Structures are given as C-alpha cells and as structure tokens.
Amino acid sequence: MSTINTDTNETMPHISVNAQYIKDLSLENPSAPSSLAALDQRPQIDLSLDINITNLSEENFYEVELNIEAIARNEKYKLFQIELKYAGVFNLINIDSEQHPVLLSVHCPAMIFPFARKIIASCTQDAGFQPLMIDPIDFGALYHKKMSEHQN
C-alpha cells in the first residue's frame, strides 16, 4: 500500500502569485483620425521593456513590475504610443534566497507577461489599430545579458 503526501504545498518550494494588477496605463493616439486612414502599410514598432523588482515588507514577498512601452510609426505619422506598468506580487515559498534573483527576473515576469501582452493588444485594437501582439520574450536571455553586462 502506498502513502500519498498531502502536505506538499507547505514543504515543497513554489511560487505563489498573490496579486496581479495594472499600475499605470497610457495610450496616445495623437494623429487620429488621419492616422487611421493611413494604415495601408505595416508600421514600424519600437518596443522597450524593463523589469523592476521591489522587496516588500513581508518576508519573501516581492513585487515584480513589467514596464512596457511601444511606439508605432509610419512614414507620415506617429500612430500610437502605449505605456503599461503591470505588476504581480509573488511569495517565494521554501526557496533558497540564492535562487530569488533568477526567479524574480525570469520566472515571475514570464508568469505575468501574457496578461500584459493581452492588455496592450486590446488597447491598441480599441484605439482603431490592429492589435499589437508582442512576440514572446525570453526573460532568461535578458537576465543573462544583464548579468554579463553588470560583470563587465
């Protein structure tokens, strides 16, 4: 007869997502309605992403914030500019503190990114454009690049 351990959540290392939320959202559509008529070609998209990590007052609780900005332009107009600060509160349970930086910089952003991506797609579509579907982001590669730049 086998025994099943039902106590796994209390002892196993895991990440708990306690909250997800929009901290700030801004969309500018400065050339409308003229820019909406000029959508015969695919716009140039300039995208920037930053991650902010804040240690909260309660032990092993962190806020991970994605800052995403996208600017779309064509030959004539700045079509739109969208800025989103989207965050999550994470509890790192039974995880060695040496692993916290990589988890907070890679795994936690990857968990909330699909929600931020959806918000940006919905907002740009509601502004009269094709939804901006941001490609998946390799947060691991970004983390390793940042670490190698920091060492140099």
From Swiss-Prot:
Superkingdom assignment: Bacteria
Gene Ontology annotations of biological process type: protein folding; protein tetramerization; protein transport
Disulfide bonds: none
Classification via InterPro entries: SecB, SecB-like_sf
Location in the cell: Cytoplasm
Presence of the UniProt keyword Amino-acid biosynthesis in the record: no
Keyword hit for Transport: yes
The protein's name: Protein-export protein SecB
Source organism of the structure: Rickettsia conorii (strain ATCC VR-613 / Malish 7)
